[in-house]
Amino acid sequence: MSLLQSALDFLAGPGSLGGASGRDQSDFVGQTVELGELRLRVRRVLAEGGFAFVYEAQDVGSGREYALKRLLSNEEEKNRAIIQEVCFMKKLSGHPNIVQFCSAASIGKEESDTGQAEFLLLTELCKGQLVEFLKKMESRGPLSCDTVLKIFYQTCRAVQHMHRQKPPIIHRDLKVENLLLSNQGTIKLCDFGSATTISHYPDYSWSAQRRALVEEEITRNTTPMYRTPEIIDLYSNFPIGEKQDIWALGCILYLLCFRQHPFEDGAKLRIVNGKYSIPPHDTQYTVFHSLIRAMLQVNPEERLSIAEVVHQLQEIAAARNVNPKSPITELLEQNGGYGSATLSRGPPPPVGPAGSGYSGGLALAEYDQPYGGFLDILRGGTERLFTNLKDTSSKVIQSVANYAKGDLDISYITSRIAVMSFPAEGVESALKNNIEDVRLFLDSKHPGHYAVYNLSPRTYRPSRFHNRVSECGWAARRAPHLHTLYNICRNMHAWLRQDHKNVCVVHCMDGRAASAVAVCSFLCFCRLFSTAEAAVYMFSMKRCPPGIWPSHKRYIEYMCDMVAEEPITPHSKPILVRAVVMTPVPLFSKQRSGCRPFCEVYVGDERVASTSQEYDKMRDFKIEDGKAVIPLGVTVQGDVLIVIYHARSTLGGRLQAKMASMKMFQIQFHTGFVPRNATTVKFAKYDLDACDIQEKYPDLFQVNLEVEVEPRDRPSREAPPWENSSMRGLNPKILFSSREEQQDILSKFGKPELPRQPGSTAQYDAGAGSPEAEPTDSDSPPSSSADASRFLHTLDWQEEKEAETGAENASSKESESALMEDRDESEVSDEGGSPISSEGQEPRADPEPPGLAAGLVQQDLVFEVETPAVLPEPVPQEDGVDLLGLHSEVGAGPAVPPQACKAPSSNTDLLSCLLGPPEAASQGPPEDLLSEDPLLLASPAPPLSVQSTPRGGPPAAADPFGPLLPSSGNNSQPCSNPDLFGEFLNSDSVTVPPSFPSAHSAPPPSCSADFLHLGDLPGEPSKMTASSSNPDLLGGWAAWTETAASAVAPTPATEGPLFSPGGQPAPCGSQASWTKSQNPDPFADLGDLSSGLQGSPAGFPPGGFIPKTATTPKGSSSWQTSRPPAQGASWPPQAKPPPKACTQPRPNYASNFSVIGAREERGVRAPSFAQKPKVSENDFEDLLSNQGFSSRSDKKGPKTIAEMRKQDLAKDTDPLKLKLLDWIEGKERNIRALLSTLHTVLWDGESRWTPVGMADLVAPEQVKKHYRRAVLAVHPDKAAGQPYEQHAKMIFMELNDAWSEFENQGSRPLF
């Protein structure tokens, strides 16, 4: 029987009930359905959609035919949508151009056989879709202008009826497939499943989350080809209302006239920009051209209203003497008189779209052959059968091709920037990008010219992409650190500059938020856009909506500010956050009456403050309070994250002093962009990250940070990458492969940019002065510390080869050089000359231009020739004097002869050598005038000592205090200033200390004299760190214990003119390695007074390094390597570290490593006299006792934070509860631990309990036995009326909770 059934199914027509497609609905066919007074017999299936089926039903009494729509729903949301559709149809029914509503009914899922709620919708039966009739007429030529006029006019009449309702009903899914042809030949509009009365008015206050929700809802109810620009681009902030139906009507009119859709492929960019074309040689439909243009306006406010459209159509009809309301009989006549033969069948059917259950409409073949089956084959059905087989095969092939094409999730933002999701391995690769497929794709399309940037915390083997992977991820649900984001942009820019074929491939986990932040920042970094909205918009169009948070957009705006025409450089001033104020009080309590907030503050990845306390000690703010204030009083600098939580008390948490926390929101910003005179930083509701549901935040909710910007700069531990970088030369053309591509992108996305939305930048209130944000570049010399950040362990930067980058201090370059040396040996690429190492380093730089190399040779000649120092001619002074040199900044410039000293500016820098590093003079703003290759600047090279240049002015005046510090240049004398005290601090006039590498010094001036004969002492100026507030007064103290053997040591073979570690001559434009300590310790060297008391001579360590010694008169670079440079290497090679010394190393106060490298990189440090004596804690007790201090610390006081908390808790806590808390500490719900220590918490006089050890509680049976014994011993019923009754209750509760946890975990044995 089953074989016969299968044969019948095969022979059945595609629309019949015997096929597989109709088997699920066959039980409904043939049944009798009662809807009110009508008894209907279901005859056959007309169509089926996503969750609805359309049947032909006949009234048993009158024989009239209807269309019965059966909708199935298993979700409450679908139920509401179906009910809304029924309501709209009832409201709109009666119009001649809208499908007539007859009746409706529903049953719940409990009564339904399908297990889903069922809805029945009865409407008139129509002949079929208009599109089917139009297809029949295609072979006969285009439609006449009068036919188009009648079809479109009747459609607009239906839409006008919808828009006249109160409130207006928006169809939202107008398309030619939803236009039916009635029995009488009139147009009928159907499918109101997507209709709505809600309009949206986006503005700058909308958050990204709100936009995403609206976009998702609209996308679910619209068709791609008919979507409007304001729907696709919600960031345009155009209103979304009735005018979206006008756009769809324009598409329908275009389709009726020219037989093709204006946006056939549904391309978003073409729709957003309104890029369509009317055939230039069309003369038949000229009367409609202006109407099409007026309806397809990108700005919805410029489109015609439906009343204006109908009015223009009436004028056209009057001019052509046509009645637009008359039936369109020409369609029925040209289709063989199909309509007249069946007019007695009754009203035509409604047809629903996919959104409401029916997607395709009623096919004409189903009317021609309503009962397909075996007779179809005899009447030519064989042809249709094989046609269907062919169509099915082609669809299968197309779906397989689409799957293969879409299997690789990669999108090109430009031809040189690609974004993809995480390249997965193993089982995960079946769902995501397979890493092998990604590699094959990139190798075939960009062989040897792509670099991968991994922004996710997960990693994979870099060898999969030929060791060209940069690991630069950051924590999830946060914005990246500003220096990390800047370094990524700079590295991508350097990689794209090296070769016009190079591309950057960026990925995070899903290729959305994190990738969008990096890519959009890079687009702004290259000055393609000047606002974050424009960059995010391009990313959304090219890939997908990124779903970024306000803090993400805020950091993209930071990048825009830093590369603007008037750049804003983040200042280095700390900020005191006094309090966090929330107004009004957010509603996070269970009663929605207020909140109990506490705050956590993070600087970078480190938590620096928390206001969390015991639940009862934190204030509960109510709505009546008006605002919630959290006092902080914490000083922060850099990337700051403030997280606000709501504290909730949990059941049983009172006993264990625990509570639950619920995140309310978080804020992330960089302190360098807070104006100096700001007192309040305001964040509106749309500026907050990680927000909860909107009902918990009252209207006009905002968060204010009460801040105070400290007047002095605080040097950072590492020099920020933007410190002296020049933004000249940044051009968006680097993002594109051709000029045509650039012009195409500019034509699509280069529209006038909107002003910034307030979601990306906070508002500031100033206490005094101008409320506008001042320039945020630092007033004092920034830090030049040599710490290498964690990011530089995976990304090593090389500056561009143009004159566009500012000078960087030599110490940071030396540390980067050390990092690059570490990587050079381990870098092995399977492609020759791969630009990035296995740890994801910077690509190699191209060879220098000949002109640049020649310029560097000339610079080296300055160091090769020994010339006596020539005093410059006196120069006239100008009036304004900068006595403290606060306007100087670190810069490097070309070496100039002494006579080249020009007249100084009005600011005379008198203390430049005391408060800032020695600098080279420049003729203009501080720029890299020599355009050195970063390879030559990889190690500290000695600049000539010329006065520092004030910002934006000519060289500074003479420095009368310059001789107080060691000589730092070839011409050691400042202009017209004798070195009066040079011998006090210099061991020799020609000896250059390690921390101040320079060319050989000139003879001392005649007026200089070593009055105290201290010149023979081996100095150690490397200890003298510059600081504006705390100078290192004892910087050279340890020089007494150092050996002077190195002062006369022979020069290594590599020494001559200046050499960098790579073996190449170092240019003079690099700066001296003078670091500024963040917290200088003037007594840092006291512990090393006797570091070398054995008198053994100091020798040179292996590797050519000279530790802590002064260079020879001919010495150039203080640190050198004897290893020859690798051929074609982009980084200097690394010298192997020497064996470690046995002596105790000096204390290191740097956070990561020293400016001049780690101890193993500098070699063995030979002791001079003797080892350091060990200092005990009582060595200074006599000094302390004489001054009235106790010689010994108080041993009774708390030593840990936990002990301090216990003491604080003991002040207002019941001693009994305190004893119990001590017992359960670290043993919460651990039955074995509680039983083994139960004897420590029992009351006095309890003798029934015998202590047990952990060895007696191994097996579950043993635990159960001793638990029962413990319960019998401490049961509260046995302690009734006793003074220890409450004590017994608390012990019993803890044991009971622990036993329940033990059973829930399966009563597992201990081993």
UniProtKB/Swiss-Prot annotation:
Region Disordered, annotated ranges: 709-729, 749-788, 801-860, 913-1035, 1047-1150
Chain positions found as Phosphoserine: 2, 16, 456, 770, 783, 811, 826, 829, 834, 939, 1096, 1176, 1185
Residue numbers of N-acetylserine PTMs: 2
Tissue specificity comment: Ubiquitous. Highest in testis.
EC number in record: 2.7.11.1
Reaction(s) catalysed by this chain's protein: L-seryl-[protein] + ATP = O-phospho-L-seryl-[protein] + ADP + H(+); L-threonyl-[protein] + ATP = O-phospho-L-threonyl-[protein] + ADP + H(+)
Compositionally biased region (Polar residues): 967-976, 1070-1080, 1109-1124
Active-site residues, Swiss-Prot/TrEMBL: 173
Pfam families xref list: Pkinase (PF00069), PTEN_C2 (PF10409)
Modification Phosphothreonine, positions: 776, 794
Assigned keywords, A-Z: Acetylation, ATP-binding, Cell cycle, Cell junction, Cytoplasm, Cytoplasmic vesicle, Golgi apparatus, Kinase, Methylation, Nucleotide-binding, Phosphoprotein, Serine/threonine-protein kinase, Transferase
UniProt enzyme class: transferase
Compartmental location: Cytoplasm, Perinuclear region; Golgi apparatus, trans-Golgi network; Cell junction, Focal adhesion; Cytoplasmic vesicle, Clathrin-coated vesicle
Cited function: Associates with cyclin G and CDK5. Seems to act as an auxilin homolog that is involved in the uncoating of clathrin-coated vesicles by Hsc70 in non-neuronal cells. Expression oscillates slightly during the cell cycle, peaking at G1. May play a role in clathrin-mediated endocytosis and intracellular trafficking, and in the dynamics of clathrin assembly/disassembly.
Name of protein: Cyclin-G-associated kinase
Gene name of the record: GAK
